[in-house]
């Protein structure tokens, strides 16, 4: 993507989400015909095709070569804006844990049909696709600090909708549409953070660290949510998640007000 990587990232990333939806519905239809025991073989075929297709992609001009000595990440991670952002990411994903781990079972316990549950998940992905396609508009008119704050506040509202309107499909639908902000917009901001603060040789490890913080947040949150799920109710767990995510606002102050023009 070269110098346009931040600007074009969302438009390219949306196709991953499109592929997810197509894959889910296609594989679901295929499993109506073949036994589920064939699923590993089916996934292996798909992965093999993707692997073979990858060889058709040409190496871009000016692509970074391998480094003999890796540039240290610690100096970058110590920057206030970077440390604050990854802390916010952990808190955000910690609050997502009940959703990623228990949302489907939560809805099933409330007598939502499998079709309704599948539709709600699909709407979440559709909302992120829309965000990936049009997020550059937000970056033109709003500061990075403001956008992260909006992501946190709307995520809190999302979990409140899940809890308060737990028995209502329309309430869950609105909550899923907010996935555009709680995941979509925040993810794009994360990529801009990496492009802006990490050198070309560091960006792969920067994205790996981003994924690590993502996994840690969900993992720790899932452990606690799982422990208290039977002690409390699903509604109470999501209300707690709505409060927890707001702690991320304590770290927004250290984020820059603007993203450098080179990454906008």
Q: Model-predicted segments: where are they?
A:
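Intracellular juxtamembrane helix-capping segments at the cytosolic ends
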Residues: 1-3, 185-198
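Helix-to-loop junctions at the C-terminal end of transmembrane segments
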Residues: 31-32, 131-143, 229-230
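Helix-loop boundary and gating motifs at the non-cytosolic
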Residues: 81-120
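Structural signature of the two symmetry-related core transmembrane helices
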Residues: 146-161
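Helix-loop junctions at membrane interfaces in 12-TM secondary transporters
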Residues: 163-175
